[in-house]
Amino acid sequence: IFAEKPISHEVHEVQEAVDLALKSNLPFVCGYQRRSDLNFRALKEQLSNGAIGQLKMIKSCSRDNPVPPLEYLRTSGGIFQDMLIHDFDMQEWLSGGQVPESVLAVGHCYSPEIQQMGDLDIVAVMVKYSSGLVTMIDTCRD
């Protein structure tokens, strides 16, 4: 089963889908388009075969310009589920599946319309892994 994100905005619904796939002995994958990007694939290959040395830091910068329609943003799950999820996936994939040791996230909302939804429009995230890897993400809706 190949699913597009978000599978759900509720963790228990995602777990139900995973459990059903396991019970049915079916593969279950959530696809992220950056893993198909030739440049990211080349980077992953170079990291995997040691061609560019040890991964010590990942920095990513994502923008969503122009800002998506408010109708979409109301159902998107928020900036973490809509935008940052792609950066988190890249960190997990490029790091070989390392699990974060600590995470710091800060954000703000400049748009009154987005603020009314209880969401943010600018976020910075730092992640530290036990291997020493440090990652930084800066994301903004515009």
Cite the ranges covered by each PLM segment.
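Short beta-strand and adjoining strand-loop segment in the mid-core
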Residues: 43-51, 77
